[in-house]
Amino acid sequence: VSTVPGLTKRFSILQIALFVLTLSALAVIPPKSRCYAQEAAKPAAPKPKYRLSSDSLPQEETPKGKLEGPFLFKSKILVGTVRKYWVYVPAQYDASKPACVLVFQDGQRATNPNGVLRVPNVLDNLIFKRQMPVTIGIFITPGQLGEEYPETLGFSNPNNRSVEYDSLGDAYARFIVEEMLPEVGKTYNLTKDPEGRAIGGASSGAICAFTVAWERPNEFRKVISLIGSFTDIRGGHVYPELVRKNKRKPIRIFVEDGFDDNRRPDNLKRDWHIQNQLMVAALKDKRYDLNYVFGEGGHSDDHGGAILPDILRWIFRDFEK
């Protein structure tokens, strides 16, 4: 076989170069198992963003109510605690007429002008548009054990929150009915009609609100539950069974939760969304005056804040405005 001078040498060098390039390429290609893992680890879908509507924002044409406080309060029922509270007074308040009442737990966050609930703004707008009655708002923090309420807490939770909010029984209901309403009632004309009293909250504040109405349906008959903690923190997971076993109470309730709210497939009693589903099912079975919305979020106030104006319209839908 004849050869061309220099070609064999050049061919050998080319073979070696191709071999080295092949090895280099193989070195950066992961094994199949790694390829599959990379394919599975796709970027997480962006979390849904709920935006506040104009009903939750200050409007030039809307008269602005007063937010008074914070005031300090030491309870004789929830012994050894001190807390803050604020009172919202709408511009349309007339002392000669009893005003409806909205009590909101975790008042430090519910009144935050930069938060996602912004309840005073919502009240300003809906009352002005006659989409809910003239309503006094009472926004209460959980209790802090001790003599002083630390200013450093800011929007954080006082240390007696879980005891007060997550516990079943009538202690917190008594605190609201026997202490807070009379305290605010010294200054403002509050309705004594339970149909004109609403109570709400988020997370543990939501189960707390339900407990107040459950224990005192002749004092409160409207409940707003946002991402409610109807879970086994302090026994709240039994509420669906209690609802089914007891005679229906005259309570209207709006339930909001997210499909990704604190999921616990290993312990359904601590799975927030499952427990909210069970609660809704029990309330439906007993034919409660119920409305509910399940969003796509997790354990966050974002969704509840975005729909709060609609919730309040529904809660007070048949009350004189």
Language-model regions: role of each:
Residues P5, P31-K32:
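Hydrophobic alpha-helical membrane-insertion segments
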Residues S12-Q15, S54:
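Intrinsic-disorder/low-complexity regions
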